From Swiss-Prot:
It is a single-pass membrane protein. Activates macrophages and polarizes them into M1-like macrophages through the activation of the MAPK and NF-kappaB signaling pathway. Upon activation, up-regulates the expression of CD80, CD86, CD69 and MHC II on macrophages, and induces the release of pro-inflammatory cytokines such as TNF, IL1B, IL6, CCL2 and nitric oxide. May play a role in inhibition of proliferation and migration. Expressed in renal cells (at protein level). Expressed in epithelial cells. Its main location: membrane. This is Transmembrane protein 106A. It comes from Homo sapiens (Human). Keywords: Cell membrane, Immunity, Innate immunity, Membrane, Transmembrane, Transmembrane helix. It is found in: Cell membrane. GO terms for biological process: glycoprotein biosynthetic process; innate immune response; macrophage activation; positive regulation of canonical NF-kappaB signal transduction; positive regulation of interleukin-1 beta production; positive regulation of interleukin-6 production; positive regulation of MAPK cascade; positive regulation of MHC class II biosynthetic process. The lineage of its organism: Eukaryota, Metazoa, Chordata, Craniata, Vertebrata. GO terms for cellular component: plasma membrane.
Amino acid sequence: MGKTFSQLGSWREDENKSILSSKPAIGSKAVNYSSTGSSKSFCSCVPCEGTADASFVTCPTCQGSGKIPQELEKQLVALIPYGDQRLKPKHTKLFVFLAVLICLVTSSFIVFFLFPRSVIVQPAGLNSSTVAFDEADIYLNITNILNISNGNYYPIMVTQLTLEVLHLSLVVGQVSNNLLLHIGPLASEQMFYAVATKIRDENTYKICTWLEIKVHHVLLHIQGTLTCSYLSHSEQLVFQSYEYVDCRGNASVPHQLTPHPP
């Protein structure tokens, strides 16, 4: 009888040992789990089953069951801390800084080179003149010069010239020409234009025709508008000048190009 009880006790101890050994270790850091409908197994650093240790939480994907559906097998996302060396945060900050710096430098250069600067129009004076008379009128044909200076870092195009010539506050000549004059960046060009005038004034006629008068000059007031275009933008430049023209004979006075202002 005593022998029977001792055998029964040893059998129960062996059974308890086998039952305890089949349980997973509470402090283990990895638990195998598999997807439903698949023979593949994965290893996770966070146990899927809840434990008494406060450092572990229940896996939100498998809800502690240790298995995930097969359709979610390729949708697992690994969360990596920002300070992880695999992200190389120092290099990331450097790349962001260099990108911002390059954008700022590029923008500054674009603004500097494309910022519109002044286009200067300066009348350079009379180049030549021819005169003719009839019984009461003076026909005076003059050729003048305009110096055009482009202060921009891109070319401009002069498209139109409109002007009028006045004598004693009366319009004696008009010009309206369509042009295609190209002026390069930081360059200057000379433009010639001709105006045919007709003066009908008795006193002016006497000044130009009487031989007793030694000085045969008439004062002409020239005012005009020059239209130029650049970067899909048109600009009108106003200029004016006063010219003393010899109305007794023909004249030719060449002028040099005015240098571009610094």
